[in-house]
Amino acid sequence: MQIVVATHNEGKLVEIRRILEEDLGADAENIELVSAGSLHLPDPVETGVTFQENALLKARAVAIRTGLPAVADDSGLIVDVMGNAPGILSARWAGAHGHDKANNALLLAQIEDIPDDKRTARFRCAAALVVPDTETGADVTGGVAADGITVHTTAADGSPAPVHARYAIKSETVELGDMPGRIIREARGEHGFGYDPLFVPDDQPAGRVSTEPDHEGEPLTSAEMTPAEKNAISHRGKALKALVPAIEALLH
Protein backbone atom coordinates (compact mmCIF):
# COMPACT_ATOMS: atom_id res chain seq x y z
CA MET A 1 0.00 0.00 0.00
CA GLN A 2 1.22 3.48 -0.85
CA ILE A 3 0.84 6.24 1.73
CA VAL A 4 1.74 9.78 0.78
CA VAL A 5 3.59 11.97 3.27
CA ALA A 6 2.44 15.54 2.69
CA THR A 7 5.86 17.16 2.43
CA HIS A 8 8.32 18.38 -0.18
CA ASN A 9 11.17 17.85 2.29
CA GLU A 10 12.83 14.51 1.58
CA GLY A 11 14.66 14.73 4.90
CA LYS A 12 11.34 14.83 6.74
CA LEU A 13 10.16 11.83 4.68
CA VAL A 14 13.20 9.86 5.85
CA GLU A 15 12.59 10.86 9.48
CA ILE A 16 8.89 9.93 9.36
CA ARG A 17 9.69 6.62 7.66
CA ARG A 18 12.24 5.79 10.38
CA ILE A 19 9.80 6.60 13.18
CA LEU A 20 6.89 4.63 11.70
CA GLU A 21 8.98 1.60 10.79
CA GLU A 22 10.05 1.19 14.42
CA ASP A 23 6.43 0.76 15.57
CA LEU A 24 4.88 -0.89 12.51
CA GLY A 25 7.27 -3.81 12.71
CA ALA A 26 6.54 -6.44 10.05
CA ASP A 27 3.66 -4.32 8.70
CA ALA A 28 6.22 -1.78 7.49
CA GLU A 29 7.09 -4.14 4.62
CA ASN A 30 3.56 -3.68 3.26
CA ILE A 31 3.73 0.12 3.14
CA GLU A 32 5.53 2.34 0.66
CA LEU A 33 5.88 5.92 1.84
CA VAL A 34 6.21 8.53 -0.91
CA SER A 35 6.39 12.30 -0.63
CA ALA A 36 3.94 14.82 -2.05
CA GLY A 37 6.96 16.44 -3.68
CA SER A 38 7.78 13.29 -5.64
CA LEU A 39 4.21 13.35 -6.99
CA HIS A 40 4.57 17.05 -7.94
CA LEU A 41 1.66 18.08 -5.72
CA PRO A 42 1.48 21.76 -4.69
CA ASP A 43 1.65 22.80 -1.06
CA PRO A 44 -1.73 23.81 0.39
CA VAL A 45 -2.20 27.18 2.07
CA GLU A 46 -1.97 26.67 5.83
CA THR A 47 -5.03 28.61 6.96
CA GLY A 48 -5.58 26.72 10.21
CA VAL A 49 -5.25 28.39 13.59
CA THR A 50 -4.00 25.26 15.40
CA PHE A 51 -1.41 22.59 14.69
CA GLN A 52 -4.23 20.06 14.32
CA GLU A 53 -6.03 22.09 11.66
CA ASN A 54 -2.89 22.65 9.60
CA ALA A 55 -1.88 18.98 9.74
CA LEU A 56 -5.35 17.99 8.54
CA LEU A 57 -5.29 20.60 5.77
CA LYS A 58 -2.02 19.23 4.41
CA ALA A 59 -3.15 15.60 4.56
CA ARG A 60 -6.54 16.39 3.01
CA ALA A 61 -4.97 18.24 0.11
CA VAL A 62 -3.05 15.08 -0.83
CA ALA A 63 -5.78 12.51 -0.15
CA ILE A 64 -8.54 14.24 -2.14
CA ARG A 65 -6.28 14.65 -5.18
CA THR A 66 -4.55 11.26 -5.25
CA GLY A 67 -7.03 8.81 -3.75
CA LEU A 68 -4.24 7.57 -1.49
CA PRO A 69 -4.06 7.71 2.32
CA ALA A 70 -2.02 10.71 3.42
CA VAL A 71 0.02 11.50 6.50
CA ALA A 72 0.96 15.05 7.45
CA ASP A 73 2.30 16.83 10.47
CA ASP A 74 2.47 20.39 11.72
CA SER A 75 4.66 21.38 14.60
CA GLY A 76 6.18 24.31 16.39
CA LEU A 77 7.54 25.76 19.60
CA ILE A 78 5.34 26.92 22.47
CA VAL A 79 7.02 29.22 25.01
CA ASP A 80 4.99 29.58 28.19
CA VAL A 81 6.05 33.10 29.13
CA MET A 82 5.20 34.29 25.60
CA GLY A 83 1.59 33.16 25.82
CA ASN A 84 2.27 29.99 23.80
CA ALA A 85 3.98 31.88 20.95
CA PRO A 86 5.52 31.39 18.45
CA GLY A 87 3.16 28.42 18.00
CA ILE A 88 1.94 27.84 14.45
CA LEU A 89 4.10 30.79 13.34
CA SER A 90 7.32 29.12 14.54
CA ALA A 91 8.87 28.63 11.09
CA ARG A 92 8.28 32.26 10.10
CA TRP A 93 8.54 34.00 13.47
CA ALA A 94 11.08 36.53 12.18
CA GLY A 95 9.19 37.04 8.91
CA ALA A 96 10.80 34.77 6.32
CA HIS A 97 9.72 31.12 6.32
CA GLY A 98 12.43 28.72 7.47
CA HIS A 99 15.04 31.34 8.42
CA ASP A 100 16.31 29.50 11.48
CA LYS A 101 19.03 31.93 12.58
CA ALA A 102 16.69 34.93 12.40
CA ASN A 103 13.94 33.07 14.25
CA ASN A 104 16.33 32.00 17.00
CA ALA A 105 17.80 35.49 17.35
CA LEU A 106 14.37 37.08 17.68
CA LEU A 107 13.21 34.53 20.24
CA LEU A 108 16.32 35.06 22.38
CA ALA A 109 15.86 38.83 22.24
CA GLN A 110 12.21 38.56 23.27
CA ILE A 111 12.94 36.53 26.41
CA GLU A 112 16.37 37.97 27.22
CA ASP A 113 15.25 39.28 30.61
CA ILE A 114 13.35 36.14 31.61
CA PRO A 115 15.10 34.17 34.39
CA ASP A 116 16.22 30.63 33.63
CA ASP A 117 13.53 28.96 35.74
CA LYS A 118 10.78 30.78 33.80
CA ARG A 119 12.02 29.87 30.30
CA THR A 120 9.90 26.73 30.09
CA ALA A 121 8.68 25.66 26.67
CA ARG A 122 7.60 22.65 24.66
CA PHE A 123 7.64 21.49 21.09
CA ARG A 124 4.22 20.32 19.94
CA CYS A 125 3.36 18.21 16.90
CA ALA A 126 0.02 17.28 15.39
CA ALA A 127 0.14 14.27 13.07
CA ALA A 128 -2.82 13.51 10.81
CA LEU A 129 -3.91 10.54 8.72
CA VAL A 130 -6.59 11.20 6.10
CA VAL A 131 -8.11 8.29 4.19
CA PRO A 132 -10.00 9.06 0.95
CA ASP A 133 -13.23 7.39 -0.15
CA THR A 134 -12.12 5.78 -3.41
CA GLU A 135 -15.47 4.03 -3.94
CA THR A 136 -17.72 7.09 -3.85
CA GLY A 137 -15.35 9.63 -5.41
CA ALA A 138 -16.10 13.33 -5.68
CA ASP A 139 -16.28 16.06 -8.26
CA VAL A 140 -16.27 19.22 -6.23
CA THR A 141 -13.89 22.11 -5.75
CA GLY A 142 -12.58 22.40 -2.23
CA GLY A 143 -11.82 19.50 0.09
CA VAL A 144 -14.32 20.08 2.85
CA ALA A 145 -14.45 17.77 5.86
CA ALA A 146 -16.80 17.58 8.82
CA ASP A 147 -15.31 20.64 10.48
CA GLY A 148 -15.97 22.77 7.40
CA ILE A 149 -12.34 23.63 6.65
CA THR A 150 -11.73 24.01 2.92
CA VAL A 151 -8.37 23.11 1.39
CA HIS A 152 -6.71 25.75 -0.80
CA THR A 153 -3.49 25.90 -2.75
CA THR A 154 -1.84 29.00 -4.23
CA ALA A 155 -2.85 30.28 -7.69
CA ALA A 156 -0.36 31.72 -10.19
CA ASP A 157 -1.17 35.25 -9.03
CA GLY A 158 -0.50 34.33 -5.41
CA SER A 159 -4.14 34.22 -4.34
CA PRO A 160 -5.70 31.19 -2.59
CA ALA A 161 -7.27 28.74 -5.04
CA PRO A 162 -9.59 25.93 -3.88
CA VAL A 163 -8.24 22.44 -4.50
CA HIS A 164 -10.25 20.31 -6.93
CA ALA A 165 -11.27 17.20 -5.02
CA ARG A 166 -11.26 14.01 -7.07
CA TYR A 167 -12.13 11.97 -3.98
CA ALA A 168 -14.25 12.51 -0.90
CA ILE A 169 -12.85 11.95 2.59
CA LYS A 170 -13.62 8.66 4.30
CA SER A 171 -11.92 9.11 7.66
CA GLU A 172 -9.55 11.38 9.55
CA THR A 173 -7.34 10.80 12.57
CA VAL A 174 -5.18 13.39 14.29
CA GLU A 175 -2.85 12.87 17.26
CA LEU A 176 -0.76 15.24 19.38
CA GLY A 177 2.70 14.85 20.87
CA ASP A 178 4.63 17.19 23.17
CA MET A 179 8.31 17.44 24.09
CA PRO A 180 8.66 19.64 27.21
CA GLY A 181 11.84 21.48 28.10
CA ARG A 182 13.32 24.96 28.38
CA ILE A 183 15.02 27.64 26.28
CA ILE A 184 18.70 28.33 26.99
CA ARG A 185 20.57 31.56 26.28
CA GLU A 186 22.87 30.56 23.40
CA ALA A 187 22.78 27.97 20.64
CA ARG A 188 24.51 24.61 21.08
CA GLY A 189 24.80 21.63 18.75
CA GLU A 190 25.04 20.85 15.05
CA HIS A 191 22.13 18.43 14.52
CA GLY A 192 18.45 19.13 13.96
CA PHE A 193 16.95 22.34 12.68
CA GLY A 194 14.75 25.24 13.73
CA TYR A 195 14.92 25.98 17.45
CA ASP A 196 16.73 22.71 18.32
CA PRO A 197 20.01 24.47 19.28
CA LEU A 198 18.17 26.56 21.90
CA PHE A 199 15.97 23.83 23.37
CA VAL A 200 16.94 21.52 26.24
CA PRO A 201 14.37 18.69 26.56
CA ASP A 202 13.36 17.54 30.03
CA ASP A 203 13.94 13.93 28.95
CA GLN A 204 17.62 13.24 28.38
CA PRO A 205 19.48 10.20 27.00
CA ALA A 206 21.11 8.20 29.77
CA GLY A 207 24.81 8.84 30.33
CA ARG A 208 25.08 11.69 27.82
CA VAL A 209 25.88 15.33 28.59
CA SER A 210 27.11 18.32 26.64
CA THR A 211 30.77 18.50 25.69
CA GLU A 212 30.56 22.06 24.34
CA PRO A 213 33.22 24.44 25.74
CA ASP A 214 31.96 26.26 28.85
CA HIS A 215 28.95 23.89 29.00
CA GLU A 216 30.60 20.55 29.78
CA GLY A 217 28.33 18.32 31.84
CA GLU A 218 25.15 20.28 31.13
CA PRO A 219 22.02 18.60 29.68
CA LEU A 220 21.95 18.22 25.90
CA THR A 221 20.04 20.47 23.55
CA SER A 222 17.95 18.78 20.85
CA ALA A 223 20.69 19.76 18.40
CA GLU A 224 23.33 17.90 20.44
CA MET A 225 21.37 14.65 20.35
CA THR A 226 21.71 12.01 17.67
CA PRO A 227 18.65 11.54 15.42
CA ALA A 228 17.84 8.28 17.25
CA GLU A 229 18.06 9.96 20.66
CA LYS A 230 15.83 12.81 19.55
CA ASN A 231 13.26 10.56 17.85
CA ALA A 232 12.89 8.52 21.04
CA ILE A 233 11.56 11.55 22.95
CA SER A 234 10.44 13.98 20.25
CA HIS A 235 7.02 15.52 19.82
CA ARG A 236 6.91 14.28 16.22
CA GLY A 237 7.85 10.77 17.28
CA LYS A 238 5.11 10.69 19.93
CA ALA A 239 2.43 12.00 17.57
CA LEU A 240 3.38 9.66 14.72
CA LYS A 241 3.60 6.64 17.00
CA ALA A 242 0.06 7.43 18.20
CA LEU A 243 -1.07 7.24 14.54
CA VAL A 244 0.25 3.70 14.10
CA PRO A 245 -2.98 1.88 15.13
CA ALA A 246 -4.94 3.84 12.51
CA ILE A 247 -2.32 3.02 9.86
CA GLU A 248 -2.33 -0.66 10.86
CA ALA A 249 -6.12 -0.71 10.49
CA LEU A 250 -5.69 0.10 6.79
CA LEU A 251 -3.73 -3.12 6.33
CA HIS A 252 -6.01 -5.55 8.15
Swiss-Prot record:
* A GO BP annotation: nucleotide metabolic process
Cofactor stoichiometry and binding remark: Binds 1 Mg(2+) ion per subunit.
Catalytic reaction(s) noted? XTP + H2O = XMP + diphosphate + H(+); dITP + H2O = dIMP + diphosphate + H(+); ITP + H2O = IMP + diphosphate + H(+)
The record's annotation in SUPFAM superfamilies points to: ITPase-like (SSF52972)
**CDD domains attached to this UniProt entry:** HAM1
Quaternary structure note: Homodimer.
Q: What is this protein called?
A: dITP/XTP pyrophosphatase
